């Protein structure tokens, strides 16, 4: 048996089809749409990288948590934050009382990372185990959204991103709640994505060892909605709750 191709190529959908690996490799990287710089250029397994804007949007639209990194007087800080995409911008929000976020008033360089985990990859050797994933890293200056119209648009985007349909089915933020919240905007410009979606990449010498190899697919799936005990009885579960699902875009 010949050894599999060493370089595992990226595919934009989350469906693992071993036979399509070869065809995916022929495509190479998509033409740069996001801005490629020294920081965003992928050097290791460059064949998994892309600067395609639509592919980046698909990852961001499916993800739910971003890890935001920035320098502070106390060193490098990384904070998990909820986010939403508004066109070609990411909006993030947190509490005005946060000592970290209050320092963003004049704008601050950040890196934003979103990762979707699609599978655990089991190889013959412990060293060759891996994960299938889709990820984006974005660099830019985070600026504070101060106008009320912009903040209101961001609040709606946050809820629509995580629970489509809920904004119209809930009380909107009042002035006090808006004043207690800081909204940050980061351009989706200097960024790159990286995707792994393929079987184990065992070396030829390990292929005959006889261990089970393959992929354990992983995905985020909702369970049955749990009603709040203090809610008025007889309330029907909304369709957007009963049919909740994250977007999956190829």
Segments predicted by a language model, with ranges:
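A generic structural signal for short beta-strands and their flanking turns/coil linkers
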Residues: 64, 79, 86-88, 106-110, ...
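C-terminal edge-of-domain segments
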Residues: 8-9, 18-40, 146, 150-250
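A generic structural motif
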Residues: 90-94, 184-185
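Short, structured beta-strand-loop surface elements
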Residues: 97-157
């Amino acid at each position: 048996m010949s050894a599999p191709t060493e370089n595992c190529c990226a595919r934009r959908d989350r469906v693992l089809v071993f036979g399509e690996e070869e065809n995916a490799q022929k495509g190479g990287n998509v033409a740069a749409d996001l801005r490629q710089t020294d920081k965003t250029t992928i050097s290791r397994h460059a064949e998994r990288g892309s600067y395609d804007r639509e592919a980046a949007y698909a990852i961001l639209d499916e993800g739910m948590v971003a890890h935001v990194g920035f320098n502070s007087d106390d060193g490098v800080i990384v904070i998990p934050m909820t986010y939403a995409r508004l066109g070609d911008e990411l909006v993030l929000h947190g509490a005005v009382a946060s000592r970290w976020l209050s320092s963003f008033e004049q704008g601050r360089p950040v890196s934003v990372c979103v990762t979707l985990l699609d599978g655990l990859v089991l190889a013959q050797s412990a060293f060759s185990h891996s994960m299938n994933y889709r990820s984006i890293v974005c660099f830019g200056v985070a600026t504070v959204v101060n106008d009320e119209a912009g903040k209101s648009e961001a609040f709606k985007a946050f809820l629509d991103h995580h629970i489509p349909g809920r904004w119209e089915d809930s009380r909107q933020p009042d002035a006090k709640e808006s004043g207690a919240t800081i909204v940050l905007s980061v351009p989706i410009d200097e960024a790159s994505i990286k995707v792994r979606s393929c079987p184990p990449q065992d070396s030829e010498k390990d292929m005959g060892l006889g261990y089970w190899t393959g992929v354990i697919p992983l995905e985020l799936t909702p369970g049955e909605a749990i009603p709040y005990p203090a809610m008025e009885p007889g309330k029907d579960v909304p369709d957007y709750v009963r049919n909740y699902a994250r977007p999956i875009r190829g």
